[in-house]
Amino acid sequence: MATKKTARRRRPAANRGSNSHAPKFERVLAVFAHPDDPEFGAGGAMAKLAKDGAEVTYVIVTDGSQGGEDPKQKDADLIAIRQREQRASARVLGIKKVEFLGYRDGHLSHNLKLRRDIVRMIRKHKPELVITHIPARVLDAPMGGSHPDHLAVGEATMAAVYPDSRNPRAFRALLKQGFAPHVVNEVWIPFWTMGDFYVDISDTIDLKLDALKKHKSQVAKPGAEWDVDKWVRKRNRDIGKKGGYRYAESFKRITV
């Protein structure tokens, strides 16, 4: 008697990089150039990581002093505003620790001083996962993602992860200061046009938007025609379609 074969369903190719295969993390370090960069790139994923029990720490490299429209506003005032906004935004996502390195906004370059300071943060917080900017200019996406500060932070962070943070012979003064070498397991780079690892943020998209709205100096400017809620939902919905979710963020996932 002939038997009917049961077809084995294959998971769609777009889902093969889904977060169902991501390990649990105890400590996560998010290294970004400016206040509001973490939320735009990975706010939903970081809220999810925090909900799952990870201790997520932000490292904001610049002072955010170029993120304003009024040339008469004092730098010190804008810096203070942006730091308050960043702390408030982080709290919405369940993130309690925010470190500010204080580099001048718009003046970053990938150099040894920046690498050393990021290595110090990695050795201090000992993350298993680091999230940071893409270290290369992307020509098929809006230019905002390829801000020169983003490129500098992305490249410096990648170099800090490997080889510097694990190498006892790199930045030896850090050893004397008590910062022992540390090995990072993974790096995630937000990459919304060409990401191949999708994190389902359907349950955290509202948290992401609430966090972004704390950056009032950036998303609620008088006369602005930009609807951040509409823009973010569309972008993360489009990414979600690729990953098989209602809303998603996409990353390049690198095993160190």
Task: Specify the residue positions occupied by each region the protein language model found.
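Metal-dependent de-N-acetylase/amidase catalytic core
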Residues: A2-L29, L112-V256
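Active-site rim/loop-helix segments in enzyme catalytic domains that contact anionic ligands
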Residues: A2-E128, K252
